[in-house]
Swiss-Prot record:
Name assigned to this protein: Ribonuclease PH
Species of origin: Rickettsia bellii (strain RML369-C)
Signal peptide stretch: none
Encoding gene per record: rph
GO MF terms held by the record: 3'-5'-RNA exonuclease activity; tRNA binding; tRNA nucleotidyltransferase activity
Keyword Coiled coil: no
Swiss-Prot/TrEMBL GO biological process terms: rRNA catabolic process; rRNA processing; tRNA processing
Length: 239
């Protein structure tokens, strides 16, 4: 039993609030336990220079943590004049994940920007951002099709992500901050809706982990994202 009372294979309580932002084409406030992330998807007709006149679209992402999202105030990176390596890593992860589930040719010469702003951080912010961003992107595509900006749906898959780790020698699902801070192994799994993997991030924080432990984490992650996919589908089908 974990400090939170959860079982090793148990996700934190999850909610997905659709369209909390009125100006973005699509938005979602995802809450996983005490980790809350506002995700939005905005449409633009300007694509990166390398894609001009190629009738091919692009999806990019930006990620940030609000100053009050952590126990000690987190300084705004804009004030410091540069993004941290962590921020750049996470927004690249979100961007390439979203591009992997879109037919960029069908998107046409358009760009969708995914914005992920962490309101409250208690572990798993990047995986929450990915899971919420899919919902925001889905809503944005639906809006663009309704406006007849898009004639064909470019979405080709679903995506969700979850963290796993080795904590006190036990593989566990969906680490909170206290677990993440003291874990022997920290990993993130990004899955497509068809069961294929999009990305795996895994680090031995204290000691190397075995293939058997990795496979146990993979099994936990597959079961966890199955629950996330089910929740995504429930909220989107009820529109």
């Amino acid at each position: 039993m974990r400090q939170s009372g959860r079982k090793s294979n148990q996700l934190r309580p999850i909610s997905l609030e659709l369209s909390p932002l009125i100006n973005a084409e699509g938005s979602c406030l995802i809450k996983i336990g005490n980790t809350h992330v506002m995700c939005s998807a905005s449409y633009d007709t300007t694509v990166p220079p390398f894609l001009r006149n190629q009738n091919r679209g692009w999806i990019t992402a930006e990620y940030s943590m609000l100053p009050g999202s952590t126990s000690q105030r987190n300084k705004r990176e804009a004030v410091q004049g540069k993004q941290s390596g962590r921020t750049q890593e996470i927004q690249r992860l979100i961007g390439r994940t979203m591009r992997s589930i879109i037919d960029l040719q069908k998107l046409g010469e358009r760009q969708i920007t995914i914005d992920c702003d962490v309101i409250n951080a208690d572990g798993g912010t990047r995986t929450a951002a990915i899971t919420g961003s899919y919902v925001a992107l889905h809503l944005a595509i639906r809006s663009l099709m309704k406006k007849r900006i898009l004639k064909v749906n470019p979405l080709i898959n679903q995506v969700a992500a979850v963290s796993c780790g080795i904590y006190k020698d036990q593989p566990i699902l969906d680490l909170d901050y206290l677990e993440d801070s003291d874990a022997e192994v920290d990993s993130n799994f990004v899955f497509a809706g068809n069961g294929n993997l999009i990305e795996i991030q895994g680090t031995a924080e204290k000691k190397p982990f075995s293939e058997e432990q990795f496979l146990e984490m993979l099994k936990l992650a597959k079961a966890g994202v199955a629950e996330l996919f089910k929740l995504q589908n429930q909220v989107l089908l009820n529109l």
